[in-house]
Regions:
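Primarily auto-inhibitory N-terminal propeptides
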Residues: 7-107
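Structural recognition of the beta-strand scaffold that forms the well-ordered cores
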Residues: 19-21, 67, 91-93, 136-140, ...
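Protease zymogen maturation seam
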Residues: 56-63, 81-136, 144, 148-150, ...
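Subtilisin-like serine protease catalytic core
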Residues: 124-156, 162-211, 226-232, 307-310, ...
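Substrate-binding/access-modulating region of protease and related hydrolase catalytic domains
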Residues: 127, 132-133, 200-308, 320-322, ...
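C-terminal subdomain of the subtilisin-like protease fold in secreted/lumenal serine endopeptidases
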Residues: 226-237, 268, 310-313, 381-469
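A cross-kingdom C-terminal cell-surface attachment/processing module
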Residues: 485-503
């Protein structure tokens, strides 16, 4: 590593003045997009703010309205807390920044980097299935490089929303579903699967909660309104915010509510990286750490969310089965996350091998999560009628107790094993006690009523049509293979430009 990224002096944990708000359903029925926009504008004006973006389709059933409003004079965090006391508001939060969860280290590609597939005993399950073209996995990330020949046959171009110019999303996608048995590159957990790249993070690997909510709503719409058979949603990113984990705080948080709207469909397992700062999921930080953790009293999200029944948090393992020193502790499960070889940007010519496939070796909980996402899709290819909750139960129920004192003593994660998950699925499928189809109904979150899902996602159609353009950033791109940048996808970056509905807005 010869260089480090330069950080913006003005960068903070959230976008200045931005608050994501979920308004209560309007009292009148039959609201239109125009009336939703008017209501958002009226609300913002009443608070001395203005509308930065709306998601009007959420109001089509009269169940609520997502919007981002901006104040030129108030701190976003204080403003959000004030808005939570407004009777019109269901949820409010600052527009926190999020980052791809890759460690600031890179290693040289070598043949042993496929160790992860053997560690989870994937080959023993490949004897039964190598995947299915009827199964989809959504990757909410930086996009997927359409030109990588080891991914192209498994990318669903109709639903994917933007190509990758950073590298993180492409690497994650390869772990899930690089095309297998084709004589080039690497193999993913699935050799046959349909990958949907949902671009929510920018060229520098960073984004905001509003960007992520856009991605979640897009995936929710594909499942609920278009019938797309998505069995896993991979979310390999993290942010540290001061939201204390509790029922009352979560139900008032827009990020949690968007995830819950996806969760209650019970169609897709939501797989989340635990984070890379040696913290504990659900526990407060004790001090400032680098540019990611502002100080004491912060929590890693989305990994610390509770009440998302179909979510699995994933820590990272070393090759010896111990927990990686960078991995956050307290995840549901741990999977290979150190020195993982996978697909990368074709534009990084120094990464392109003799067979024409760009490959790179990276470490992080970002790499651990897609092993689990890929496994959920592979298990679904064997038994397609499994619900998300049944897939989660198979994955966790079939995990192995760690033989590593480091893992057991420090965090208690079980070790993910695909073969054992498959055995659990075969043994207990149909057992209403050990593999129930639906989550329990007696929890403190059971009374949550889902909001309507969008039917016209905000900016993704523009990416697909080539009208939206690429995000641009002054923060620098992803590292890797003589890229010339330093840390890979971690840090606080300068504000970037996002294209939304052909309107360029600085966020």
């Amino acid at each position: 590593m010869s260089a480090a990224l330069s950080f913006s002096a003005s960068a903070s944990e959230y976008e200045d003045g931005d608050v994501i708000v979920v308004l209560r359903p309007a009292e009148v029925s039959g609201g239109t997009v125009a009336s939703s926009a008017f209501r958002a504008a009226s609300f913002a004006a009443s608070e001395g703010a203005w509308v930065k973006e709306t998601y009007p389709e959420l109001s089509e059933s009269g169940s609520g309205l997502y919007t981002v409003i901006h104040s030129d004079t108030r701190d976003a965090k204080e403003f959000a807390e004030e808005l939570k006391n407004n009777p019109e508001v269901l949820a409010a939060s600052p527009n926190y920044r999020v980052y791809a969860t890759t460690t600031p280290t890179e290693t040289t590609v070598n043949a042993t980097d496929t160790w992860g597939l053997f560690s989870i005993d994937a080959p023993s399950v490949w004897d039964t299935s190598t995947g299915s073209r009827n199964i989809y996995v959504a990757v909410i990330d930086t996009g997927i490089d359409y030109s990588n020949p080891d991914l192209a046959d498994n990318i669903n171009f109709a639903y994917s929303t933007g190509t990758d110019t950073h590298g993180h999303g492409t690497h994650v996608a390869g772990i899930i579903g690089a095309y297998g048995n084709n004589g080039v590159g690497v193999a993913g957990v699935n050799w046959r699967v349909q990958l949907i790249g949902v671009r929510a993070l920018a060229d520098n690997g960073g984004g905001t909660i509003a960007d992520v909510i856009n991605g979640i709503n897009y995936v929710t719409d594909l499942i609920a309104n278009k019938g797309v058979n998505i069995k896993a949603v991979n979310m390999s990113f993290e942010t540290y915010i001061s939201l204390v984990p509790s029922h009352d705080n979560f139900v008032k948080d827009p990020f949690w509510r968007a995830l819950k709207d996806l969760d209650v469909l019970n169609k897709a397992v939501i797989v989340v990286a635990a984070g890379n700062y040696s913290q504990t999921v659900g526990q407060p930080t004790t001090k400032k750490q680098g540019n990611m953790i502002p100080g004491a009293g912060y929590y890693v999200y989305p990994a610390s969310f509770e009440g998302i029944d179909n979510m699995i948090t994933v820590g990272a393992l070393n090759t010896d089965g111990s927990l990686a020193n960078f991995s956050n502790k307290g995840a549901n499960i741990a999977a290979p996350g150190v020195s993982i070889l996978s697909t990368y940007l074709q534009s990084r010519t120094s990464c392109v091998k003799a067979d024409g496939v760009s490959l790179h070796t990276i470490s992080g909980t970002s790499m651990a999560a897609p092993f689990v996402s890929g496994a959920a899709a592979l298990l679904a290819s064997i038994k397609p009628d499994l619900t998300a909750y049944q897939l989660k139960r198979a994955i966790l129920g079939g995990s192995r107790a760690s033989s590593s004192e480091q893992v057991e003593a420090s965090s208690g994660e079980s070790i993910f094993n695909l073969s054992d998950a498959y055995d659990y699925q075969k043994t207990y499928a149909g057992n209403a006690t050990l593999m129930p189809a639906t989550p329990p109904t007696n929890t403190e979150y059971s009374d949550y009523t889902a909001h309507a899902v969008i039917s016209k996602p905000s900016y993704y159609e523009e990416y697909k049509n080539g009208d939206g353009g690429s995000d641009s950033s002054s923060g620098g791109g992803g590292g890797g293979c003589n890229a010339g940048s330093g840390f890979f996808a971690v840090g606080i970056f300068a504000p970037f430009v996002m294209y939304v509905k052909r309107r360029k807005i600085n966020i």
